[in-house]
């Protein structure tokens, strides 16, 4: 300790970095006469008392105020912490409102098409409409026999077929060998083969003809078509899962939070501000975590796309909570009053909230999410409930923010309950694909192409706690299918839960082979996600790129477009499906499904190309495939596809086919939007992150002149 003397009756000492004041009482006076009856200053403690001296050490860090009550009251009167963070939330809402305004034109265009009001909301059972009946002239049209498809097991490229008028107008026939009109994926109990299990209504009459357009959906260009250069740069990949656009939003949000935490505040001496900032963002984190959230509904995006921002906002909240708590803990530790403060109820509640926030952050890491998903979910549910309760006990002004978060969570739980269906499902193991096919016949409507559901399997075969796990899977079938197959999921065997599901499906097949009907009870929740305000059928061309199990998204989208084309509700002229697999044997179980798609009498040209990337075990599969002819326009290639060439082919066909109607405006649906030119090309991609990066690069590299000619090129990632 260093000692210093002042001229007056009070002298200043320094004890390390703490200010020490010496008060020598005068004769006949007491400490009370000096105003020191209890504690001379808030958050101070008596270092020593001697007959003529009194040492008081001021705490280096105070609660809400500064070192003196007068300055604290002045600061409080000039700066309202609660109002400040409330204004921060208003800024966040204002930014959201701007984004919603940008999405309104396309949302309005979507909902002018009446069926869109009721699609993608609730899973249900619907009466299947009678399949489209062709007029007599079309029904009696000659059918071209099926010729053997082009098959190139060594070709490294898979470019799309060239365009010519004869090709687009010709009739062709899909294979009906071994398929009745009601083949409908009925299980072949005698063979039990995956090929028979996937069998679906392959039409025996399939000449491609022009349809009468009954109710074409209106088309509205997206901002990526209006501002292609800006969109291209925003979609550049910084690292897997992070684009420039996401990074920009994250950076802007971080700047706003840091600004709110530092403006007229020192986080080391005034930790209260960081607490206010953390509490104000709790509703943001909770709302972005819900499956049914208002921002997603307004923007037309699924919860899975907002989950990235939920995780980031959650990390910032945990950081702010720790800064807030450590400021007080440090001050109490130096003052030696840590245990005394823990006897105060609201301080104990604050410590509980701190522990909950850190536990949530720890169990939210990718390790726990990927390896121990059940632990991640359990800690999240328990941790959030305790955290919100502790915040209310810790700070009364925080209650409104907590109530908003609780209201959003409660609404989500109610909607999830409403969107859940209890049903009976059939399981089929697809050995070549390493997938389990789940079919729920009783649920046949209520979803849009590209959406997914969350499923629980209520079977002891999934383990003691298998019923507690809920997993998302893309829907691989079309709603209200004339094949009456219901909702179909294809679950890739990739983890413990999906492996148990695959084994359960195998046991189910053995039971059926012995004459026993076996299935499982499931809880299906959804649908969620999907293309949002984007209408695939409103474009002139479509390219779907799928990698591995991503074929479920592509199958659903293409089958939906085929059905809409049959009803005269599609503008599409060209549909191209590219599927990238490791082994060509993965094509075998899906040949009936592809045959069904290609055999439809559609106005649009359809081509499917499958590319395998590993030739090690390809010989046996190629030998099997060579024994039966592939349907027309289904091709198999070795090596990766040239997506740029394929996209160029789709653009050419979309532009050329539109010339048939050029000069006579096409009458749109309810939107009243007419067009005499192409309505753009949509590229849908589902698969590994690298595949999505390649697709974004190819879309961004389209020449501006060709982009304008076709009406824009947009991309949808699932």
Residue ranges: model-predicted function:
Residues 68-78, 97-105, 120, 128-142, ...:
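Reductase modules of NAD(P)H-dependent flavoproteins
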Residues 221-418:
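Membrane-embedded alpha-helical bundles of multi-pass integral membrane proteins
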Residues 440-543, 559, 565, 637, ...:
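FAD-binding FR-type
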Residues 47-78, 321:
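Extracellular/lumenal N-termini and interhelical loops of multi-pass eukaryotic membrane proteins
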Residues 369, 374, 378, 382-392, ...:
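Membrane-proximal cytosolic interface modules of multi-pass membrane proteins
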Residues 97-121, 287-295, 369, 403, ...:
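Transmembrane-helix exit/juxtamembrane "anchor" motif
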């Amino acid at each position: 300790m260093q000692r210093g003397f002042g001229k007056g009756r009070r002298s200043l000492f320094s004890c390390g970095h703490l200010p020490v004041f010496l008060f020598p009482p005068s004769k006949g006076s007491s400490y009370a006469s000096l105003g020191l009856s209890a504690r001379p200053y808030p958050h101070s403690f008596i270092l020593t008392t001697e007959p003529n001296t009194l040492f008081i050490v001021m705490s280096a860090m105070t609660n809400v105020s500064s070192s003196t009550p007068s300055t604290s009251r002045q600061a409080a009167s000039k700066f309202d912490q609660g109002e400040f963070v409330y204004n921060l939330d208003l800024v966040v809402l204002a930014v959201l409102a701007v984004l919603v305004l940008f999405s309104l034109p396309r949302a309005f265009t979507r909902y002018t098409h009446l069926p869109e009001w009721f699609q993608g909301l609730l899973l249900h059972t619907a009466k299947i409409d009678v399949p489209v009946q062709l007029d007599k002239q079309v029904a009696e049209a000659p059918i071209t026999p099926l010729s053997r498809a082009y098959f190139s097991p060594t070709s490294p490229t898979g470019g799309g077929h060239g365009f010519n008028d004869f090709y687009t107008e010709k009739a062709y026939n899909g294979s009906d060998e071994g398929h009745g009109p009601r083949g409908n994926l009925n299980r072949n109990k005698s063979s039990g083969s995956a090929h028979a299990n996937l069998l679906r209504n392959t039409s025996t009459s399939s000449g491609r003809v022009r349809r009468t357009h009954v109710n074409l959906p209106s088309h509205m260009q997206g901002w990526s078509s209006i501002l292609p250069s800006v969109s291209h740069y925003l979609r550049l990949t910084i690292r897997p899962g992070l684009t420039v656009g996401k990074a920009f939003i994250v950076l802007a949000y971080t700047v706003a939070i840091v600004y709110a935490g530092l403006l007229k505040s020192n986080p080391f001496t005034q930790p209260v501000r960081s607490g206010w900032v953390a509490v104000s963002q709790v509703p943001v984190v909770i709302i972005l975590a819900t499956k049914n959230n208002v921002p997603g509904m307004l923007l037309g995006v699924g919860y899975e796309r907002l989950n990235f921002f939920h995780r980031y906002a959650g990390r910032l909240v945990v950081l702010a909570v720790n800064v807030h708590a450590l400021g007080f803990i440090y001050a109490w530790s130096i003052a030696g009053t840590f245990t005394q403060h823990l006897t105060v109820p609201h301080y104990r509640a604050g410590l509980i909230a701190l522990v909950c926030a850190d536990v949530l952050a720890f169990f939210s890491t990718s390790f726990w999410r990927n390896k121990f998903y059940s632990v991640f979910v359990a800690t999240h549910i328990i941790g959030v409930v305790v955290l919100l309760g502790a915040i209310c006990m810790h700070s009364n002004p925080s209650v409104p923010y907590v109530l908003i978060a609780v209201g959003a969570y409660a609404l989500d739980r109610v909607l999830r309950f409403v969107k859940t269906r209890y049903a009976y499902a059939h399981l089929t193991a697809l050995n070549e694909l390493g997938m389990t096919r789940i079919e729920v016949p009783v649920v046949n409507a209520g979803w849009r192409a590209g959406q997914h559901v969350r499923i629980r399997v209520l079977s002891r075969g999934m383990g003691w706690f298998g019923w507690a796990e809920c997993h998302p899977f893309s829907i691989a079938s079309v709603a209200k299918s004339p094949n009456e197959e219901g909702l179909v999921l294809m679950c890739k065997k990739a983890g413990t839960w999906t492996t148990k599901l695959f084994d359960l499906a195998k046991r189910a097949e053995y039971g059926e082979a012995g004459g026993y009907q076996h299935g499982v009870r499931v809880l299906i929740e959804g649908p969620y996600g999907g293309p949002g305000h984007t209408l695939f059928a409103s474009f002139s061309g479509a390219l779907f790129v799928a990698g591995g199990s991503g074929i479920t998204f592509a199958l659903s989208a293409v089958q939906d477009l085929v059905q809409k084309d049959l009803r005269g509700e599609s503008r599409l002229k060209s549909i191209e499906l590219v599927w990238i697999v490791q082994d060509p044997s993965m094509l075998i179980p899906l040949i009936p499904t592809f045959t069904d798609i290609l055999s439809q009498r559609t106005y649009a040209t359809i081509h499917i190309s499958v590319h395998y990337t590993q030739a090690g075990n390809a010989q046996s599969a190629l030998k099997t495939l060579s024994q039966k002819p592939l349907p027309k326009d289904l091709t198999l290639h070795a090596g990766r596809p040239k997506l740029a060439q394929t996209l160029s082919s789709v653009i050419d066909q979309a532009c050329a086919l539109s010339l048939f109607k050029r000069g006579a405006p096409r009458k749109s649906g309810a939107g009243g939007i007419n067009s005499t030119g192409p309505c753009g090309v949509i590229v849908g991609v589902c698969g590994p992150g690298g595949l999505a990066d390649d697709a974004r690069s190819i879309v961004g590299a389209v020449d501006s002149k060709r982009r304008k000619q076709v009406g824009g090129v947009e991309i949808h990632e699932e």
